[in-house]
Structures are given as C-alpha cells and as structure tokens.
Amino acid sequence: MSNAITMGIFWHLIGAASAACFYAPFKQVKQWSWETMWSVGGIVSWLILPWTISALLLPDFWAYYGQFNLSTLLPVFLFGAMWGIGNINYGLTMRYLGMSMGIGIAIGITLIVGTLMTPIINGNFDVLIHTEGGRMTLLGVFVALIGVGIVTRAGQLKERKMGIKAEEFNLKKGLLLAVICGIFSAGMSFAMNAAKPMHEAAAALGVDPLYVALPSYVVIMGGGALVNLGFCFIRLAKVQNLSIKADFSLARPLIISNILLSALGGLMWYLQFFFYAWGHARIPAQYDYMSWMLHMSFYVLCGGLVGLVLKEWKNAGRRPVAVLSLGCVVIIIAANIVGLGMAS
C-alpha cells in the first residue's frame, strides 16, 4: 500500500473522528431549543466556514464561481440539498427505531448507496467487477457493512442491558425513514462526484491538491443549509412552544456560552469534511468513490470508540463491549482490504 493511500485512509479516519465527536458540545447547550442550537451550529458549519476558507484559498473568489454555468452548479447544489433531507430524517429515524438500530440501518444503506451508485452513474462499475483491485475494494465494502452490522448489534445489546428504548418505537415508520435517510444522506457522495469540475478548476488556479475540494463546499453545503435551516426556521415560527426570542432572552453569560458551544459543534462538524477533502485527494482517481465507504465505516468505528472513552458502555456488561470490539476490528480489516485493493 502506497504512502499516499495510507495517508488518504488516515485523513478519512481523522475526519470521521471529528464527526463522531461533533455533537458533544451541543449536549452542553442549556435552555435552548434544538432548532436554535442546530441553526447556530449550522450557520457556522455550512455557511461561515466554507465561505471563509474558500475566500482564503481562491485568488479571486467571485471569478472562480462565476466561471461555472448553471448546469455545473445546480447538480452540486441539489445533491447538497439531498444530503440535507437525509440529515433531517436521521434524527427522526433515531426516534422511531432507537439509536443503535437507526444508525445501523441508515449508515448501512448510505454506505452502500453512496459508494456503489457513484461508479454506476459514471459508467465505470465494470472496474469493480473485472479488475483484481476492483473486486478487492468491493470485498472491503461488504466487510465494512458486516462490521457496521456487528457494531449495531453491540448497541442493541447495550440498550437492552441498560433499559434504553426508542422514544416512540414504530418499526414500519422507522424503517421507512431509515431507508429515506440512508439514500438521501448519500447525496454528499454524489455532490463530491458532481463537483469534480470545480475541483479541477481550483487545481488550475494553483490551489494545493489537499484543498481543491473545499471551494465546492460553498455550493454543496449551501444546498444542505437551505434544507436544514429552512426546517429549523419554519418550526421556530410555527410550533407554539418554540421561540427564538425566548432562547435569546436568557441571561447574557448563558447566551454567550450557548453560542460558543454551538459554534464549536459546528466547527467540529465542518472539520469532518475538511479532512474528508484531504483523504479524498490521496485516494487514486479511479477509486475516489471509496472515500464515502471509508468515511461512513470509520464514523461507526469512531462512534463506538468515543462511547467507550466517555464511559457510555460502563454499565453495559462485558458481552456488548466484546461485540463492539469485534465490530471495530472488522471495520479496520475492511479499511485495509480497500487500501490493498486500491494499491493493486
């Protein structure tokens, strides 16, 4: 395995670790509605950071975006909005299926859809079937799916042991939402694929290869922001017991604390895709769709490890922790299989 591929896998791991940790600051926010908290974090992660970093990277910000016609920008934006729909459904999936089953099904579906649909769309799925490296990377995808399933099972055992139940368990509704979430969340993978002309244009301007994907985030995350912020603002305006005015009528120190914590959560959310771009840049071009598989499987891996570090599994017993450990090992094996496949 080459150093470039190894570093690509490593940066995807760092990005996934940030994704697994980003909600921790949000949990410290007090006396705010979820909608206000999510909006403040989202404004930082989907608007302020992408625009600021792109302005720093590009020699002429407006000229860069002005060179693309609508046929290039619209698919990138719409795939970003597609991801935004999946993001909203993610929380609803947890409500009706519970954390472990919801995450397992949604992540499993988005891993498969986001990874395998891209080569199908590009018309090069035969690379996966008819080359040795392609078959090995395909094997890695399915091994990762097994690892996600094992970690999901560990979570179910933990929830059963600790008496944790879904907020409003509804199998039919939950499964439907999990499928919608899984499919629509893959929009981020499709957006990165559609944004290749933007990446190439950034490279032509002399932007470092590690950073060429970052300017496209202005458009991708703009689509996601439209859906997420629109959802939050509509709820804040329509739902009786929600009020942004009330949220900002708290004591000044608490408001400042909540803003800073929400902004930190937004920063950590953004960093997952900052390092995703670094990892993506190191993956061989013919296998660039494997970035999504690495990100999502490492997200599950890091989520389990973060849970152990934060002692969320302390009272779960030995068996759930053993099953979790097995799932994490399987995901690590899957990443190595994919890495070897890309190198062959």
From Swiss-Prot:
One Pfam family this sequence matches: RhaT
Transport found in the keyword field: yes
Origin: domain of life: Bacteria
Location relative to the cell: Cell inner membrane
Predominant subcellular localization, coarse grouping: membrane
Gene Ontology cellular component terms for the protein in this record: plasma membrane
One annotated GO molecular function: rhamnose transmembrane transporter activity
UniProt keyword terms in alphabetical order: Cell inner membrane, Cell membrane, Membrane, Sugar transport, Symport, Transmembrane, Transmembrane helix, Transport
Annotated catalysed reactions: L-rhamnopyranose(in) + H(+)(in) = L-rhamnopyranose(out) + H(+)(out)
Bilayer topology term: Multi-pass membrane protein
Membrane-spanning parts: 4-24, 38-58, 68-88, 101-121, 137-157, 175-195, 214-234, 259-279, 290-310, 321-341
Free-text function comment from the UniProt entry: Uptake of L-rhamnose across the cytoplasmic membrane with the concomitant transport of protons into the cell (symport system).
Family: Belongs to the L-rhamnose transporter (TC 2.A.7.6) family.
NCBIfam families: PRK13499.1-1, PRK13499.1-3, RhaT
Protein name: L-rhamnose-proton symporter
